[in-house]
Regions:
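Basic, glycine/proline-rich low-complexity segments that contact nucleic acids
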Residues: 2, 9-18, 24-179, 188, ...
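Mixed-charge, glycine-accented linear interaction segment located at domain edges/termini
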Residues: 200-202
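Conserved small/polar residues in nucleotide/adenosyl-binding loops
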Residues: 208-210
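Glycine-rich phosphate/pyrophosphate-binding beta-alpha loops
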Residues: 196
Length: 210
């Protein structure tokens, strides 16, 4: 059965595998999450569950959020997220999902908001090369170069890579291996990097694409 959980990125470290090789890993504080809603094919036309993560004061919720959570009777939660799962029959509103919903060896997709880098140039934003730094290169070493051509077309085509805002995008990293699960500490350790800064909220879902 596919499952999901909401967590918080703690940071990165490294461990050694059985062969003695260094493996970079990310530590995630996963759950506990409370099921705050359940969607069924009969009523909504699809199957899904909504999870709530982290308690929050009542005054920090909107009226629709407060009404929804009061109806569910699960307390007030700061983060709500809906996950489409194939079989939700065994899950009910009020159930608590913890880190042990995953096990070592599972493959997961993790979604988060990437780090913000502010206004960035084409070199940092897209990895473009610089112009020659000698022999009359001029003061344009980090510029984007020619864009609009001459009289025809006399404009910049849509999609041209230019300087602009970088980061703060929703990013999903797929097919990550779960290296370790610690139910007592609500910790999940995955191989590799995941999007976002330390303390950023991430959504962990069983692998969708193989």
């Amino acid at each position: 059965m596919k499952t999901a959980i909401i967590g918080k990125k703690v940071g990165m470290t490294q461990i050694f595998d059985e062969a003695g090789k260094v493996v970079p890993v990310t530590v995630i504080e996963a759950g506990p999450c409370t099921v705050t809603g359940k969607m069924t094919k009969e009523k909504e036309g699809y199957e899904a569950i909504q999870l709530g993560y982290e308690d929050v004061a009542e005054k920090k919720l909107t009226k629709p959020e407060k009404g929804h959570l009061d109806k569910a009777g699960v307390g007030y939660k700061k983060h709500l997220k809906e996950f489409r799962l194939e079989d939700c029959a065994s899950v009910n509103v009020g159930d608590v999902i913890k880190a042990d919903t995953f096990k070592e060896g599972d493959k997961v997709d993790i979604t988060g908001i990437s780090k913000g880098h502010g206004y960035a140039g084409v070199i940092k934003r897209f990895g473009q090369g610089r112009t020659p730094t000698s022999h009359g290169g001029g003061p344009v070493h980090r510029h984007a170069g020619s864009m609009g051509s001459s009289t025809d077309p006399s404009r910049i085509f849509p999609g041209k890579k230019q300087a602009g805002h970088m980061g703060v995008d929703q990013v999903t990293v797929q097919n990550l291996d779960v290296v370790k699960v610690d139910p007592e500490l609500n910790m999940i350790v995955v191989r590799g990097a995941i999007p976002g800064p330390k303390g950023g909220i991430v959504y962990i879902l069983s692998l969708i694409h193989i």
